[in-house]
């Protein structure tokens, strides 16, 4: 085969010349439009195209095994039909034709198509040319005929003219006719040529447009093929096509078989034909389009770390959803951490944070209190940053009976200690006094061990702590605790050494003991100011006040006086006539009657304000303690009190806090530790002392509750089933009767209805005004509930000297009593080489053949052991009795 040019080859394969030159260039062959192409270059181009199209890696043979299961209804016995499952297994082999053959075939098809187009073009041109020639021939014949006719006429005229005028040789009309005939012939030839040129140009333009369209289509197909090769696998595509072909063939065979069975099968059971028709219809309607075999999920190769947003409470299921794990994974993790939880259990924020961090996630703690923040942000302080000096808040702390209230009493020039039950302070007293050098606010805290929380609360709200130490008693446990509270609050400490009027006062001892706990006197090079006072005579009190004001001046205590007030609840109680009453220490701003107060879980509008002396006031500035009325409930001591603008929003915030407090409380109560599981199992064996407790103020209630709960032991548990502030009511009495509880009133009494219920139900009611007595009596009641303890006490010991045989009693041991007394009614043990070998009771005790009840030390006796005959010489018989021992807590 001779070499062809690039242009001719492009025409043969049906591609544009530019595309073919580009493919030659990609194959490493540089060609122009008029260059010749050899067979070797064609083969090189073909190999390159095969490689680019993936022809080398394409599978040449594929075997598919298919299994189809169908149901055939056949006639059975009795005219009934039954379904028989038919399983058809097929193996089909598909052979893919070589890519080169496909390419050659495509080229041959393109070449044949081009040749057909060229042949059609040539035939069209030949047809047009033949038509033009036929038309021209017809015109020529017509012209020749006209010319012959004209010639004949001309000859006739010429002959006539010759006859008439012999001198004239030719006719002018004939010449004109000849010229006109030549002109018409030239015009006809020119029109025919112009028409042929136009038709040829149209055919060439049509061929060019067809070639461009084919080139664009082939380029698009090439681009789509490459795109498909990038995202799919040739084997998968081949498998899909083969499967589609096989599915189509299988369905045709299945339908043909079913039609044949339907014709030949006898009467079937009711509904069989409809079922088969439905199945055939389903098979006919089933899509045979190939489905993708590639899944779209890839297994993660690394752990996914998420930002988990946790609110104040969250359930186990919600936490699992936030971390995108199963709830069982969280339950397993918490079991490893020592907690047993369920899927719906509420977790507090700290627990959820630990679990999420343990599982490798980042935790973002969120506070769901946007409304609360909005309400508090709407507070305005009219004074802005204008700060004014304020009075110092001084807390009097120290051990019980060291003279705290007496010292404050002297300062206030009023008898306060005498009004306290038992001479000890039961709750915080807040007072402000005017001195010559300025005003001072005092907080008097209890010194008893039960009032730890109240002392801590006092240290939290104070500026200066005055530690009262008795000069004759020294440092005591509550003194040390007060020092710890002051250090924890980073509050300056002033030591007031009281009872200096007593002859037993020892100043050096007090300084030395305080120095051991980090409180060093200025005389000894320390930082703490010491004042030596006597609350009885008033000696040194002025020096103490001067030292307090000096310390306050050093601290530069300032606060915003104008604007909305904020403070802290010092004490709260439920008054029978006035309702909830809260003692608030104003810390900033001015508290006025009529203000809306948000106080912990409670809210309300201030209906009345009273100072510590019970006088009504209308406003209170910084460092002033005041009693307010009008709250919705009794707030907890230590809560922050804030004045807000909108009562409706304050109510919403209070309700939100109550709900959140309940959720957090439940979340903490639901914790069940693994180490407590066995204790929980045996909890039913623990005896409980149920108590209904009512107190006059919140602080005393907390102190008594903590003290009573601390009395619980492994055997007796104190269970406070109800507690509150205020008088004992009929509801309390009914609850105590139903739960077999003791009713305890601390500085409160039962009302008339409650007394009737108590009398009718025989409920144990006890009143107390001193916390010592309450704790002691509860402890005595718990002691009576303890299960008795029994102890075995040895009362006698006898040594076997000889053994006698008795026909009635068997072996009789002749013994000498070496210790104590042998009693016939007491149980005994037989010891051999100091090892107990038998435990039982005496059957016979005789002395000189007489039955006796007991034998004393140093006497001989005969002992018969019941159901035991292996008594030997040298054994010891030990007599003991079981004694009940009284138990104490």
From Swiss-Prot:
Keywords in alphabetical order: Cytoplasm, GTP-binding, Initiation factor, Nucleotide-binding, Protein biosynthesis
Gene from which this protein is expressed: infB
Ranges of compositional bias, category Basic residues: 257-270
Region (Disordered): 115-293
Region called G2, residue ranges: 423-427
Start and end residues of each stretch annotated as G1: 398-405
PROSITE patterns from the UniProt entry: G_TR_2, IF2
Localization (cell): Cytoplasm
Span list, region G4: 498-501
Organism: Shewanella sp. (strain ANA-3)
Residues reported in the UniProt entry to bind GTP: 398-405, 444-448, 498-501
Protein name as annotated: Translation initiation factor IF-2
Main location: cytoplasm
Biased composition (Basic and acidic residues): 115-236, 271-280
GO cellular component, one term: cytosol
Region G3, residue ranges: 444-447
Record's keyword annotation contains GTP-binding: yes
GO molecular function, one term: translation initiation factor activity
């Amino acid at each position: 085969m001779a070499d062809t040019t690039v242009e001719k080859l492009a025409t043969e394969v049906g591609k544009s010349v530019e595309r073919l030159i580009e493919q030659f260039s990609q194959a490493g062959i540089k060609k122009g439009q008029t260059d010749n192409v050899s067979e070797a270059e064609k083969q090189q181009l073909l190999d390159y195209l095969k490689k680019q199209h993936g022809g080398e890696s394409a599978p040449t043979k594929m075997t598919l095994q298919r299994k189809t299961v169908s149901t055939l209804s056949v006639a059975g016995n009795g005219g009934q039909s039954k379904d028989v499952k038919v399983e058809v297994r097929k193996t089909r082999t598909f052979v893919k034709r070589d890519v080169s053959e496909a390419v050659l075939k495509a080229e041959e098809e393109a070449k044949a198509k081009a040749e057909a187009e060229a042949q059609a073009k040539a035939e069209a041109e030949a047809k047009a040319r033949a038509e033009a020639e036929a038309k021209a021939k017809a015109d020529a014949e017509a012209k020749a005929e006209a010319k012959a006719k004209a010639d004949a006429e001309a000859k006739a005229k010429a002959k006539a003219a010759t006859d008439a005028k012999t001198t004239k040789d030719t006719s002018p009309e004939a010449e004109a006719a000849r010229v006109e005939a030549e002109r018409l012939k030239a015009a006809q030839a020119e029109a025919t040529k112009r028409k042929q040129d136009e038709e040829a140009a149209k055919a060439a333009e049509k061929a060019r447009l067809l070639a461009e369209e084919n080139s664009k289509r082939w380029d698009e197909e090439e681009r789509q093929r490459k795109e498909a090769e990038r995202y799919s696998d040739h084997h998968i595509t081949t498998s899909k096509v083969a499967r589609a072909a096989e599915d189509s063939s299988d369905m045709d065979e299945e339908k043909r078989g079913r039609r044949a069975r339907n014709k030949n099968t006898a009467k079937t059971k009711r509904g069989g034909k409809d079922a088969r028709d439905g199945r055939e219809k389903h098979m006919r309607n089933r899509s045979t389009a190939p489905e993708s075999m590639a899944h779209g999920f890839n297994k993660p190769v690394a752990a996914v770390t998420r930002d988990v947003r946790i609110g104040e409470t969250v359930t186990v299921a919600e936490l699992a959803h936030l971390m995108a794990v199963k709830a069982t994974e969280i339950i397993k993790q918490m079991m490893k951490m020592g907690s047993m939880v369920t899927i719906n259990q509420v977790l507090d924020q700290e627990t959820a944070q630990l679990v999420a961090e343990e599982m490798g996630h980042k935790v973002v703690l969120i506070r769901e209190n946007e409304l609360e923040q909005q309400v508090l942000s709407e507070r305005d302080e009219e004074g802005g940053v204008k700060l004014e000096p304020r009075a110092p808040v001084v807390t009097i702390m120290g051990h019980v009976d060291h003279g705290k209230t007496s010292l404050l009493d002297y300062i206030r020039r009023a008898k306060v200690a005498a009004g306290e039950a038992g001479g000890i302070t039961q709750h915080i007293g807040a007072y402000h006094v005017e001195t010559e050098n300025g005003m001072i606010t005092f907080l008097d805290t209890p010194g008893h061990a039960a009032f730890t929380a109240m002392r801590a609360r006092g240290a939290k709200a104070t500026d200066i702590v005055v530690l009262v130490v008795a000069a004759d008693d020294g440092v005591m446990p509550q003194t040390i605790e007060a020092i710890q509270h002051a250090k924890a609050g980073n509050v300056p400490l002033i030591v007031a050494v009281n009872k200096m009027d007593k002859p037993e006062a020892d100043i050096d001892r007090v300084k030395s003991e305080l120095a051991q706990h980090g409180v060093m006197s200025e005389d000894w090079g320390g930082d703490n100011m010491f004042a030596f006072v006597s609350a009885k005579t008033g000696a040194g009190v002025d020096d103490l006040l001067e030292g307090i004001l000096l310390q306050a001046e050093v601290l530069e205590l300032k606060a915003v006086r104008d604007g909305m007030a904020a403070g802290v609840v010092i004490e709260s109680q439920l008054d029978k006539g006035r309702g909830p009453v809260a003692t608030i220490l104003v810390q900033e701003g001015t508290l006025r009657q009529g203000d809306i107060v948000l106080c912990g879980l409670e809210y309300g509008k201030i209906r009345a304000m009273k100072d510590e002396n019970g006088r009504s006031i209308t406003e209170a500035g910084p460092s002033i303690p005041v009693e307010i009325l009008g709250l919705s409930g009794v707030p907890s001591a230590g809560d922050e009190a804030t004045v807000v603008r909108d009562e409706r929003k304050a109510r919403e915030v209070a309700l939100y806090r109550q709900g959140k407090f309940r959720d957090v409380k439940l979340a903490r109560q639901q914790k069940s530790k693994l180490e407590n599981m066995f204790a929980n199992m045996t909890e039913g064996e623990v005896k409980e002392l149920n108590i209904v407790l009512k107190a006059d103020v919140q602080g005393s209630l907390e102190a008594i509750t903590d003290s009573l709960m601390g009395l619980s032991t492994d055997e007796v548990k104190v269970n406070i089933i109800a507690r509150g502030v205020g008088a004992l009511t009929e509801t309390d009495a009914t609850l105590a009767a139903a739960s077999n509880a003791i009713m305890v009133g601390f500085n409160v009494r039962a009302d008339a209805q409650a007394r009737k219920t108590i009398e009718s139900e025989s409920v144990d009611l006890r009143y107390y005004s001193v916390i010592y007595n309450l704790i002691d009596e509860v402890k005595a009641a718990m002691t009576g509930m303890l299960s008795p303890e029994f102890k075995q006490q040895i009362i006698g010991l006898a040594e076997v000297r000889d053994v006698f045989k008795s026909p009635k009693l068997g072996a009789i041991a002749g013994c000498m009593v070496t210790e104590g007394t042998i009693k016939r009614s007491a149980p005994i043990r037989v010891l051999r080489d100091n090892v107990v070998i038998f435990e039982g009771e005496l059957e016979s005790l005789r002395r000189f053949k007489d039955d006796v009840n007991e034998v004393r030390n140093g006497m001989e006796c005969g002992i018969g052991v019941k159901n035991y005959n292996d008594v030997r010489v040298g054994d010891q018989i030990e007599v003991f009795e079981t004694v009940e021992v009284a138990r104490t807590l």
